[in-house]
Amino acid sequence: TASEERENGIYEYIVEMYKKAGLYYLGRPEASKPHYFHMYVNKRIEKPEDFAGLKLGGSTAFHGQYKRLGASVATLTIPEYQSAMERGVIDGVDTSIFMGATMGLPEVTRYLIGHGFYRGTPSLPVNLDTWNRIPKDLQNMMVETMAEFEKKYYAYWVEQDKLCLKEHEEAGVEILYFPPDMEKWFIECANEGSWDYAMERFPGDVIPQLKERITK
């Protein structure tokens, strides 16, 4: 969790990474459990082989997962998700259920895979030059306030996640749950696919070092 990152040294590691880019990392404004994103699909999935032949769309950040699942990929911008699902251009798409509800995905989607993956991705950076001009006591206050916000948001998110999932069911979306072994495989495809994408985009030592620090 975001709070754990502040306790085990990962937060400081990320701060130093951001500084190299001229930024100061304050924290995660959407601190969540590791099932922030879900997959919307219009074909029932019951076994791993059912992903083969599907066309899954979304940002390039999800392509590693799609490839690990055995599906073909389509790059889409977020405003295209709803219309692409409605017109059958794609068979499925990854996004948070909050964003999915906002863009109307429940209206054009038959199924939602109930096993979520990844955490909320937004971060809160500050220009490093600006940060360095802020008095130290105010810097400390901002860091402490952000840490407290992450704890409160985490609890808030857990409740909102349950409510939003219920709203999807009430809208007629069937929630699919896999057997334990298939669930494990599905989550591994998401996690390892994400690292595949990161390594491809940022070759070198940074990603392996980050993976070693933040994975359990």
Where do the language-model regions lie?
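N-terminal secretory/targeting leader peptides
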Residues: 1, 16-216
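Extracytoplasmic "Venus flytrap"/periplasmic binding protein-like
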Residues: 1-9
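Short glycine-centered helix-capping/turn motifs at secondary-structure transition points
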Residues: 9-10, 88
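Divalent-metal coordination cores built from histidine and acidic residues
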Residues: 13
